[in-house]
């Protein structure tokens, strides 16, 4: 595919040169493409190349930022219904082959607030299904709110997402899980998703110095670590055609 794309780039440059030549009434010829007397002439070779490129599989990504369903958002949902919340973007998300966003909340009923944070997000489990119904395929958990209600709510979040079929990156039952890419495929093209947060090592209260970063045997999110990220990207490139990294 890369060879075809490079050839397409050369072909487009030739067409641009042709257009420039036509504009000034000149004659330009390159790689079988020429312009004479203001008339565009395309060789059979160029036509075959363009047809080959047109037959290449394509994948459409829809990507969104922070998403949560608590506080004021929850109040609106209580008034208008959960289905209303994503109605304006549902068609766009569903039309994409893969839809990705940052889940800036736990999706759970359990857990207890971590002291000292000041702002806590926890969304009802039903919203996991709302995301799936809206066409969301994969989320990153690498942020500073997914563990607001501690490990029990985080574990419940992982379970609720798994039940709806939404893939996860950037967080997991341990560091290996958190760094493992979520790989999705459509139209014969695979994409690996990775997520990281610079807030993973922060804690908000000395009374409960809970960091969000995952450990070898403890749940959490993946942190910003340049060498680890490079290693993860290299590993992901062996698993998929393309890699998407979220910070």
Describe each model-derived feature in a short phrase.
Residues 22-247:
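Acidic, metal/ion-coordinating pockets
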Residues 9-19:
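Bacterial N-terminal signal peptides
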Residues 4-5, 16, 34, 234:
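Residues marking helix boundaries in flexible regions
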């Amino acid at each position: 595919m890369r060879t075809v794309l490079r050839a397409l780039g050369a072909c487009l440059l030739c067409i641009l040169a042709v257009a420039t030549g036509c504009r000034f009434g000149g004659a330009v010829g390159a790689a079988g493409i020429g312009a004479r007397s203001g008339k565009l002439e395309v060789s059979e070779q160029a036509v075959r190349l363009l047809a080959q490129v047109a037959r290449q599989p394509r994948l459409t990504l829809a990507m969104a930022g922070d998403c949560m369903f608590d506080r004021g958002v929850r109040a609106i949902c209580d008034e208008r219904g959960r289905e209303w919340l994503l109605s304006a973007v549902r068609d766009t998300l569903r039309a994409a082959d893969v839809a990705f966003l940052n889940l800036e909340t736990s999706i759970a009923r359990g857990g207890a607030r971590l002291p000292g944070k000041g702002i806590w997000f926890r969304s009802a489990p039903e919203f996991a299904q709302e995301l799936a119904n809206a066409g969301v395929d994969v989320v990153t958990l690498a942020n500073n709110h997914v563990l607001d209600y501690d490990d029990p709510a985080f574990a419940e979040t992982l379970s609720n997402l798994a039940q709806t079929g939404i893939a996860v990156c950037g967080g997991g039952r341990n560091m290996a899980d958190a760094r493992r890419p979520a790989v999705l495929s459509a139209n014969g093209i695979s994409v690996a998703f990775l997520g990281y947060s610079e807030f993973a090592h922060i804690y908000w209260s000395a009374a409960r110095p809970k960091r969000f970063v995952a450990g070898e045997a403890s749940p959490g999110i993946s942190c910003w670590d340049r060498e680890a990220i490079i290693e993860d990207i290299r590993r992901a490139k062996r698993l998929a055609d393309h890699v998407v990294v979220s910070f």
